[in-house]
Amino acid sequence: MTELTALNIPHMLVSAFEGIGTVGPLVHPSQSACLHCLDLTRRDRDPAWPMVTAHLGGYPAGEIACDTTLAALVAAEATRHALAYLDGHPSIVTNGTIDILPDWQRKRRTWAIHPQCRCIRNNPDSLRMVRAATRD
């Protein structure tokens, strides 16, 4: 994902495993919350998050089981948001995610650009001019 951000290419995370699917965020580089923003926010809320994410990232592709129906539902939800974006319509997964829970209910979460994330530093509009200290 770092390469997509560096190339200023919008992208969206889609995942489904162990009964829960997630669509989003739809990342507009330097304009919306990125995946690293989400990790930093989760770390702020839960100091154990880095250990959790290290465990989740240790599975080879295809190793974690996913229900076929859940996978289809997540794919349909992701397609809906991707097509809306391509048609020029705003998407609720920009600065947000939708979790599809085991009971098929949807849970929407909003995310903000994290102040410690490097993603916003790539946006020249976010740079602030700092006046040099002067001696009086």
Residue map of PLM features:
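Glycine-rich phosphate/adenylate-binding loop
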Residues: 1-136
